[in-house]
Amino acid sequence: MTVGDGDDIHAVGGSVRHIPVLLGEVLEALAPAERDIIIDGTFGAGGYTRAILATGASVVAIDRDPDAIAAGRDLEVQSGGRLRLVQAPFSTLDEHVESADGVVLDIGVSSMQLDQAERGFSFRFDGPLDMRMAQAGLSAADVVNSFKPGDLARIFGFLGEERHAGRIARMIEARREKKPFEGTLELADAIETHIGRAPKDKIHPATRVFQALRIYVNDELGELAKALFAAERALKPGGRLVVVTFHSLEDRIVKRFIADRADVATGSRHLPEAQARTATFRKAGGGVTAGDAEVAANPRARSARLRAAIRTEAPARAGDFSIFGLPKLPGIDRPGER
């Protein structure tokens, strides 16, 4: 994410100029002040954290990627005690600070992860079919080589919105019987050969499948939902929640959460009436998108959308996944999924 038109914020651990998407809008919505405690739940290359530190606020920065944490250690030392790095899923953000004045989340894979071939997030380079942000647990290769075709089709269809999900799943089943998939280019080439690619196609035929695998392997939608519940518990009254998403599935989760938590008239049938009718957030504007100049500087910003909300004094509600309308996926079990 290298966009922006002012401050020169460098990527942690590198010399590339790095300004995160919607930086100005994030700071405006978050409104960090001196002595505030802000949780950056998706530290990544440290762009938001650096900008927040520059306001005089302190930051608890969380990332489940050990490489991101290691790259940020110098910044932690330079911060004079105002930055604390935590290697953990951002869904646990309320476990690492007693209370916070703000929470910011930048959802999705970081440019640093995409640029490392050995992480297997992209087919721009050949690398192992991995995609694990935490570098532990089920890999993309495990999913591709062992899941039933019906389960693969469901993952590709829902998480990647891939219209050829069934065809691709059946192709994978036939190919892996001869030889398991191991590399990113191997899978990408197999999909392109099977589906084809017209000259007018702007994206590679494997793009949506790779997106689906990454989201599934890291349970990104579930982590986001749990992080929103955690932010509700962590934020002080008047504290601000700011979330930047890059995909309609992610944005839908954030939008539904804010709408549910700001709604004093109705609530989930699974919760006590008194709880359901207490607003724990109030909306702070609608979805904010990048301007033409930012999109021109960084095409990735085109899909970015920022949503924000302000915490009320009401006690946090119980986490209820039914408000998100997430479908049941193989190996993932959450209350309220259909």
From Swiss-Prot:
Keyword flag Cytoplasm: yes
Catalytic activity: cytidine(1402) in 16S rRNA + S-adenosyl-L-methionine = N(4)-methylcytidine(1402) in 16S rRNA + S-adenosyl-L-homocysteine + H(+)
Entry's Gene Ontology molecular function annotations: rRNA (cytosine-N4-)-methyltransferase activity
Highest taxon in the source lineage: Bacteria
GO-annotated biological processes: rRNA base methylation
Family annotation (Gene3D superfamilies): Putative methyltransferase TM0872, insert domain (1.10.150.170), Vaccinia Virus protein VP39 (3.40.50.150)
Major subcellular location class: cytoplasm
Transmembrane keyword on record: no
Keywords: Cytoplasm, Methyltransferase, rRNA processing, S-adenosyl-L-methionine, Transferase
Pfam family, one: Methyltransf_5
Reported function: Specifically methylates the N4 position of cytidine in position 1402 (C1402) of 16S rRNA.
Family affiliation: Belongs to the methyltransferase superfamily. RsmH family.
NCBIfam families in UniProt: 16S rRNA (cytosine(1402)-N(4))-methyltransferase RsmH
Name this protein carries in UniProt: Ribosomal RNA small subunit methyltransferase H
Origin species: Mesorhizobium japonicum (strain LMG 29417 / CECT 9101 / MAFF 303099)
Lineage of source species: Bacteria, Pseudomonadati, Pseudomonadota, Alphaproteobacteria, Hyphomicrobiales
